[in-house]
From Swiss-Prot:
It comes from the Bacteria. One of its GO terms (molecular function) is DNA-3-methyladenine glycosylase activity. GO terms for biological process: base-excision repair. It is an enzyme of class 3 (hydrolase). InterPro entries: Adenine_glyco (IPR005019), DNA-3mA_glycosylase (IPR052891), DNA_glycosylase (IPR011257), Tag (IPR004597). This is DNA-3-methyladenine glycosylase. Its EC number is 3.2.2.20. Keywords: DNA damage, DNA repair, Hydrolase, Metal-binding, Zinc. The gene is tag. The lineage of its organism: Bacteria, Pseudomonadati, Pseudomonadota, Gammaproteobacteria, Pasteurellales. Hydrolysis of the deoxyribose N-glycosidic bond to excise 3-methyladenine from the damaged DNA polymer formed by alkylation lesions. Zn(2+) binds at C5, D19, H176, C180. It catalyses: Hydrolysis of alkylated DNA, releasing 3-methyladenine.
Length: 185
């Protein structure tokens, strides 16, 4: 690849993330759940910080299996607070457990998480015209609606900006620059 989106920089972990994951449509409910939880961990930080800790999160949070996470106790969160591989912010760590419970409540009511998430973009990616980084929004009416709907279902740490970053990363919107080789044609 020659011209990537300029936010990628030179770190190989970020280059791989950009080239192989970011903006690629993902429909697997558990992967979407993992990502929305990780996006919540980013609040106030840079994504690279979370990306470098992603494997530690997977280990600490049972590969993001909502059923196992929902059973985690305050003692489990105490252990997470001692784990240097995680962002040691109690409310953010507790949010993963709360979000697992909300996810399971949706499932119990017959709501498929992937179908729910993708319904906000009519089940197909929105490909935006992105001539430069200045034209990329940080939130949209759709991300506001998604945030509101998730909060109504009990999710936390999922504001409208976090939801937009989630939508970008999971391919609900394609915000690759127009001249980026990863841009949907």
């Amino acid at each position: 690849m020659t011209t990537r989106c300029p936010w990628v920089g030179e770190q190989s972990i970020y280059i791989d993330y950009h080239d192989k994951e970011w903006g690629k449509p993902e429909f697997d409910s558990q992967k979407l759940f993992e990502k929305i939880c990780l996006e919540g961990q980013q609040a106030g930080l840079s994504w690279i910080t979370v990306l470098k800790k992603r494997e530690s999160y997977r280990e600490a949070f049972h590969q993001f299996d909502p059923k196992k996470i929902a059973k985690m106790t305050a003692l489990d969160i105490d252990a997470c607070m001692q784990n240097s591989g995680l962002i040691r912010h109690r409310a953010k760590l507790e949010a993963i457990v709360k979000n697992a419970k909300a996810y399971l409540a949706m499932e119990k009511c017959g709501e498929n998480f992937s179908d729910f998430i993708w319904s906000f973009v009519n089940h197909k990616p929105i490909v935006n015209d992105v001539p430069d980084l200045r034209s990329v929004p940080t939130k949209t009416e759709v991300s506001k609606a998604l945030s509101k709907a998730l909060k109504k279902r009990g999710f936390v740490f999922i504001g409208e900006t976090t939801c937009y970053a989630f939508m970008q990363s999971m391919g609900l919107v394609d915000d690759h620059l127009n001249d980026c080789p990863c841009k949907t044609s």
